[in-house]
Regions:
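Helix-to-loop junction immediately C-terminal to a conserved catalytic motif
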Residues: 49
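Conserved ABC transporter NBD signature motif
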Residues: 57-71
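Conserved ABC ATPase "signature" region
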Residues: 95, 99-118
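Catalytic Walker B motif of ABC-type/P-loop ATPase nucleotide-binding domains
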Residues: 147-151
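ABC ATPase "signature
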Residues: 205-206
Length: 232
């Protein structure tokens, strides 16, 4: 199991960011976390890389209790706000992340996000969508066993978004476990399984057909509202 989280709780002063979250993601699966902004998605992902320490619960990633340095080297993590060096070129940025993670071939990663032809461009001059794509390339350049993506396609045009999802599915088919957070319904529907999260609580999880059947609805948006208790 790539991710095993049981009863994870985290509180920031008056905010219960995570409230007894359970999550299980095997190798070879694209798992989507669907919820509005402030629902706990980012806190959960940050917990998985050791940036947030849960108050309670158990977290095991790639078979080890987190955080473990040797495990972190097998994880690719894309933050919601691209963490790039604006005064460096595209290829200098991805070379840096490849070295930090122990190596990797930058050309396939940049071609995956269609930035190979912009490799000499200064990162600070890129559009928001291009910076997002570069951040994704930096996360996957070392071919991680687990890929954690926090809102990975914000600002990316629909056609390229579909291509990126095709690429993520190909990575999963090769055994990579992928956890993707999103607040966009049609984006989340591309995942193999979904966890619906709100106010730090996992409302339900399953395939899209399973969630629709559970809520007795035909649309994922309606299912989310029903399971969240926001719709009679």
């Amino acid at each position: 199991m790539a991710i095993e989280a049981t009863g994870v709780r985290k509180r920031f002063r008056d905010v219960q960011a995570l409230d007894g979250v359970d999550l299980h993601v095997p190798a070879g699966m694209v798992y989507g976390l669907l919820g509005p902004n402030g629902s706990g998605k980012t806190t959960l992902i940050r917990s998985l890389v050791g940036l947030v320490k849960p108050d309670q619960g158990e977290l095991h990633v790639l078979g080890a209790r987190m955080p473990r340095r040797e495990v972190l080297a097998s994880i690719g993590y894309m933050t919601q706000a691209p963490a790039l060096y604006g005064d460096l070129t595209v290829e200098e940025n991805i070379h840096f992340f490849a070295r930090v993670q122990g190596g990797g071939d930058i050309e396939p990663a940049l071609r995956f996000v269609e930035l190979w032809d912009r490799r000499k461009s200064i990162a600070g001059t890129l559009s928001g969508g291009m910076r997002t794509r570069l951040s994704l390339a930096c996360a996957l350049v070392h071919r991680p066993s687990l890929l954690l993506l926090d809102e990975p396609t914000v600002g990316v045009d629909p056609q390229l978004r579909a291509q990126l999802w095709d690429g993520l599915r190909a990575m999963a088919a090769d055994g990579t476990a992928i956890l993707v957070s999103s607040h966009v319904m049609d984006e989340a529907e591309r995942a193999d399984r979904l966890g619906l999260i709100r106010d730090g609580r996992m409302l339900a999880e399953g395939t899209v057909p399973e969630l629709l059947a559970l809520a007795g609805t035909e649309r994922l948006e309606d299912a989310f509202l029903t399971l969240a208790g926001s719709r009679p």
